[in-house]
Amino acid sequence: MGDIRPQKFRHRIDTPPLRGVNIQRLFGSQRALKTVEDFTEFEQRAAYFDGDPVIATKKGVNILERGSQVHFMAEVQEEIMDFPPAPKLNIYGKLDPKKATEAELRGQEIFFGKAQCAACHMPSYYIDNLMHNLKTERFFKPQMVNGRMASADGPIKTFPLRGIKDSPPYLHDGRLLTLEDTVEFFNLVQDLKLNPQEKSDLVAYMRAL
């Protein structure tokens, strides 16, 4: 079944990269689909209809066979679309001190320390496959923006940070255009009190992932 909520109340999510999909376990706008195979079947059966059964009927149903077609599509996504190389990381997903810059090493210390990023983004892929509520309703009231009710989305999915520099924009709905924006967002939401140098070092570290 697709998302039958009125358009203005639906979640808007960024189109995520398919790289590293093999280590992810939450899919769909409501994160209710646990495997890429489930997501593939859902997209074929119920997506893109805007909750309108007439549109769904006009498109028709193209049901894929789970044991072969869905499986083969998943094989392509899971086996071929790996993360980009990260030559500065060791086998444990941490920086190799012989290859990293001073700024990157400082950023790594902040990532695992003061910024608390590793509470959700754990090496070696920097993901925990869970949902976390940042409680952003503390900062604004729901309001209509371009025909959509913008509000706090509650728990959001933890995305992997490997190759993060190559996949802007950021956050679940693409509201943060750069890594600098993202660091500042979490600095405010978590009340981290990072200074300009710490924020710069943290960005340098994430660019090395």
Which positions does each model-derived feature cover?
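Periplasmic c-type cytochrome electron-transfer domains
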Residues: 1-209
